[in-house]
Amino acid sequence: MLLSELSHPNQLHGLTVSQLEEIACQIRERHLQVVSTSGGHLGPGLGVVELTLALYQTLDLDFDKVVWDVGHQAYPHKLVTGRFNEFDSLRQQKGIAGYLKRSESIFDHFGAGHASTSISAALGMAIARDAKGENHKCVAVIGDGALTGGMALEAINHAGTLPETPFLVILNDNDMSISPPVGALSTYLNKVRLSPPLQFLSNSVQESVKNIPLIGKDLPEELKTIKGSVRRLAVPKVGAVFEELGFTYMGPIQGHDISNLINTFNAAHRLKKPVLVHVVTTKGKGYPYAEADQVGYHAQSSFNLTTGKSIPSSKPKPVSYSKIFGQTLLKICEQDSKVIGITAAMATGTGLDLLQKNIPEQYIDVGIAEQHAVTLAAGMSCDGLKPVVAIYSTFLQRAFDQLIHDVGIQNLPVSFVLDRAGIVGADGPTHQGQYDISYMRSIPNFVLMAPKDEAELQRMLITSINHKGPTALRIPRGSGRGVAVMDEGWEPLNIGEGEILEDGEDILIVAYGSMVSSAIETSKLLKDKNISPCVINARFVRPLDKDLILPLANKIKKVVTMEEGTLIGGFGSAIVELLNDNDINIPVFRIGIPDVLVDHASPDQSKTQLGLMPNQMSENIINRFNLIKNF
C-alpha cells in the first residue's frame, strides 16, 4: 500500500510489519520533502513514525481517541489520517496547521501547541467515556521533555487514583525537549532507559504470586500488605516511580521496532487500568543530519536535503532581537555576578544559549516549568540576586498567578523578557504573542516596556535589571531594525518616559514597541497626502508618559494608537483610560489585533489580514477622521 492511498488510519489494520515499515519510509520521505521546502518541525515527527503506525494498528480510530502532546510530533499522524495531499500546505496561509486542530480533522481529538497538556485531556476523555458507559480507548502520547511540566505530573497524580479506569500513557522518550531536558526526572529516565525491559513483569509477577502457597489469591485481607511487599521485592527499580503512582509500567521499549511496539500496545490495552508504556526513540530518526544535531533540527526553515544546510535568504537580515538580548545579557552577566538568566526549556529560542555556553553558573534551565521559573526567580530576588527570566510571551500565560501572587504583590525585582511578543507567523493561534500587554497591564507594581529597535532593547534591559521592582520587556520575533548596538555603556531610560519622533499638528499617533517603525512608515504616507502627524514612541505602557501624551492629545484632538497585541485591554485601552481619567473627551482610533484568533500564515500575511500594514493604516486613519485635504 502507498501512503498516498491512506484516507483513514484504520486502513493500517491487517498490514504486515514489512508493509508498515515501507509506509514508515514513505512518511519520512514526505515529511522531509515538505519541511525542507517550507520549514516546520522536523526532528520530533521523524522520531515517532514507527510508534504512530504501531499504535494505530492497535486502535479503531472511528471510536478510540489519541491526544498528542504539543503537536510537534504529530506530522506522521497527519499523514496517515487523510492529509497526504494537503501536506504541501503545512503551516501556510489557509493550509493545514503545524499543530493538531480539532476543526481540521475528526482525528485531531485535542488541539495543543503548549506542552504537558495531553495526559490531563486524555484522562478527561477517559472519565467522560466511563460516565457515559462507553468502552473506547483513550491514549496520551507525551515526550520526556513535556513530562517535566507540572501539569503532566498533576494528571499522573490524578490518574493513579483511578485503578479501574482503562487509560494509556505513552512516554515518547527521545532524551530531548527542544533542547536537552533537565532535572531529576530526566536523570531518572536516563537510568531507566539503560535498564532491561519491564514489559510484562507486572502481570507475570502477579500471576506468580497467586500460585505461591500461603500468599496467593486466597490471602486473608489483613495480610494483603505482605503480598504487596513481595511483589515490590520482585519488581526491580525500572519504572518504580510510575508503579508507585498507580500505573502499570511497561518498558523501556525500542521505539523503532514495529512488531514489538504492536505487541506491547496490545498488552497494555488488555490491562484495563492506567498503564504507562515507555518508548525510547531517536529524535530525527532516518535523517543523519537531524540525528546528529537534534537541537538544530527540532524545527527548521527551508534547507537543502542533500547537505542539510539552511537555504540562505535572498538578502542578508539584521541580527534578531533574541540574539541581541542574549549578547547584551551575557555582557551584563560578565560585569555583575548577581545577574542570573533563567529559561523554561527555550535556551536557543530566547538567546540564552550564549549565557549557557559562556557563564553556565549564571544560567538556569528549569525545563518546561514556567510557573516554577517565575517563583524561583521571585525567591532568588528576595536574597539579592537579579534574575532575568526569558520566556516566550505565549508561554508566560501559564504562570499568570505566579506573576501576580509571587512577584507583583510582593513588588520583587524580577526582570521578565517576553520573546516572540506579537504576531509570530506559521505556528498559529497557540503561539501568537498577542495577549501579554493585556494580561500584564493589570498586575500591581509591574513596569511594562517595549523597544522600537535593538538599541533601545539594550537600554531597556539595563533599565529593567537596575529597577527595584518587577519589569516586563516584550520583544518581537525575528530580525531587528539593523541599527547600531553597543557592547557596553548602555544608558538606562527614565521609567515611564516616552519620546516624540515626529512633530505634527493634524493627528497624534502613539505607538508601542514593534509598531513604532510601522507608525513612521504610516506617517510618511500621510505626509504624502499633506497630512501632518505627530508620532510618539510610548516605550512604556505601565506607567504611561502622562506629561507627554496629555498635552499633545489636548492640543491635536485626534489620537491613533498602534500596538501588535490584542485590542481588548491592551495599549490602546490604556490610552483611552488615561484620557478618560483626565476628562479629555476626544476621538481615539485604536489599531491592533481585534477579537480574533490569528491563524497560521507569514507575519506579513497576518498583518495584511488584520489591517496592520502601513498603507492600510494610513487609509484607515484618513477615513476614520475624514482627513482628506486639498493639495
UniProtKB/Swiss-Prot annotation:
PANTHER family linked to this entry: 1-D-DEOXYXYLULOSE 5-PHOSPHATE SYNTHASE-RELATED, 1-DEOXY-D-XYLULOSE-5-PHOSPHATE SYNTHASE, CHLOROPLASTIC
Keywords: Isoprene biosynthesis, Magnesium, Metal-binding, Thiamine biosynthesis, Thiamine pyrophosphate, Transferase
Binding site for thiamine diphosphate: 72, 113-115, 145-146, 174, 287, 370
Protein name in UniProt: 1-deoxy-D-xylulose-5-phosphate synthase
Family from the record: Belongs to the transketolase family. DXPS subfamily.
A GO cellular component entry from the record: cytosol
Native organism: Prochlorococcus marinus (strain MIT 9515)
Cofactors required: Mg(2+); thiamine diphosphate
InterPro entries to which the protein is assigned, alphabetical: Dxylulose-5-P_synthase (IPR005477), THDP-binding (IPR029061), Transketo_C/PFOR_II (IPR009014), Transketolase-like_Pyr-bd (IPR005475), Transketolase_BS (IPR020826), Transketolase_C (IPR033248), Transketolase_CS (IPR049557)
Cofactor, how bound (note): Binds 1 Mg(2+) ion per subunit. Binds 1 thiamine pyrophosphate per subunit.
Pathway in which this enzyme or protein is active: Metabolic intermediate biosynthesis; 1-deoxy-D-xylulose 5-phosphate biosynthesis; 1-deoxy-D-xylulose 5-phosphate from D-glyceraldehyde 3-phosphate and pyruvate: step 1/1
Catalytic reaction annotation: D-glyceraldehyde 3-phosphate + pyruvate + H(+) = 1-deoxy-D-xylulose 5-phosphate + CO2
Encoding gene per record: dxs
Subunit structure: Homodimer.
Entry function: Catalyzes the acyloin condensation reaction between C atoms 2 and 3 of pyruvate and glyceraldehyde 3-phosphate to yield 1-deoxy-D-xylulose-5-phosphate (DXP).
GO terms assigned for molecular function: 1-deoxy-D-xylulose-5-phosphate synthase activity; magnesium ion binding; thiamine pyrophosphate binding
